[in-house]
């Protein structure tokens, strides 16, 4: 898209520029394996696999749906995108949302975070 994107402000749940040790390692390993930066799709896959793995550990390897869902309710973990959890009532993901600005760093465009909303739930399911 080019330099015309510089300064654009967006809100999203992930940027490869997220400043955490886990994300830096994730970006490094992902780029090594794929020759491009990770994005929200790849980190979603990472989180999904992490959630399944941890749920299987909690269930002792039981794989039926009800047992796995029960194990996932209320789980909390550190993701490359920040602290994540599963709402025990709705079973939806609870995640940070970042306000980002497009900036050029080392000749590349990046979404750089400058504000954050923690523990954002699906607004259509939040009780009023």
Where do the PLM segments sit?
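Extracytosolic ligand-binding ectodomains
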Residues: 1-128
């Amino acid at each position: 898209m080019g330099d015309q994107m510089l300064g654009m402000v967006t809100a999203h749940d992930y940027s490869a520029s997220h400043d955490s040790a886990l994300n830096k390692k994730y970006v490094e390993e992902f780029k090594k394996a794929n020759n491009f930066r990770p994005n929200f799709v790849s980190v979603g896959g990472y989180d999904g696999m992490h959630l399944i793995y941890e749920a299987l550990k909690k269930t002792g390897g039981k794989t039926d749906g009800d047992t796995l869902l029960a194990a996932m309710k209320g789980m909390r973990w550190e993701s490359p995108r920040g602290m994540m959890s599963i709402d025990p009532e709705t079973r939806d993901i609870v995640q940070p949302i970042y306000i980002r600005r497009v900036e050029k760093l080392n000749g590349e465009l990046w979404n750089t975070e400058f504000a954050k909303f923690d523990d954002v739930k699906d607004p259509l399911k939040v009780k009023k």
